[in-house]
Amino acid sequence: MSRPVYTLYCSPDSASFIVRLALRLTGAEFAERQIDRPSGELDSPAYRAMHPLGKIPAIETPDGPMFETAAILMYLAERHPGLAPAQGSAERAAFLKWYFYTVTNLHAPLMQVFYPERVAGAECAVAVVAHQATKLQEHFAILDQMVARDAPDWLSARPSIFSFYVGVMVRWLSGFPAGHPARLTTADLPALGPILAQLETCSAAQDVAKAEGCAPTIFTAAY
């Protein structure tokens, strides 16, 4: 058996889910190391040496350990052609601006909705969730409008780091109960919804769904 090119440190249905999907697209050999959160492994010296904040994911690569989901995805796309528009291609500029729009305006406020106490303490959690949930709804609507208008190949039913990144975030937001201000499903996204419905049927998505113990409808009926 060949030695894995990558080792992903992961936890079920966390941000490592996104990286796991991308790794499946690369076709490269990779190993998975499940983190024992209850035992405090995230705070262990060995893990903190890879990720100084003790968060998931982290990944060992041929160029050393990496952390931050968006950085890992970009690294994989640069090493494995086809996961994102190539440098110098006509689509590269549009891809980059919307990729970093997603990092800043979707992923960051999403994390604040799930962990509001990190922003301003437990006493302000309700206000933080309400504010950031409104921003999330607005920012997802802007992204959906762009997809309807431009139909970019890098955010389509063709698997890519961008489509999987957005899909997993919609997955998480769909897990909130009806009436929660941050709840968002594929039904709320006229352009993106059908794309994610197709995307979840690809082999990479189905393989990861099985490995994670999820229903095969990982984006459209996640929970």
State each model region's role.
Residues 49, 201, 210:
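Phosphate-coordinating loops and pocket residues in cytosolic domains that bind phosphorylated ligands
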Residues 59, 72, 143, 163, ...:
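Residue-level signal for nonpolar/aromatic packing positions in well-ordered secondary structure
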Residues 102-198:
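GST-like fold's C-terminal all-alpha helical module
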Residues 53, 79, 149-150, 202:
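Structured helix-beta-strand junction loops
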Residues 1-130:
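GST-like domain detector, emphasizing the conserved glutathione-binding G-site
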Residues 212-223:
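Acidic/histidine-enriched, glycine/proline-rich intrinsically disordered or flexible terminal extensions
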Residues 77, 169-170, 209:
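Active-site-flanking alpha-helical
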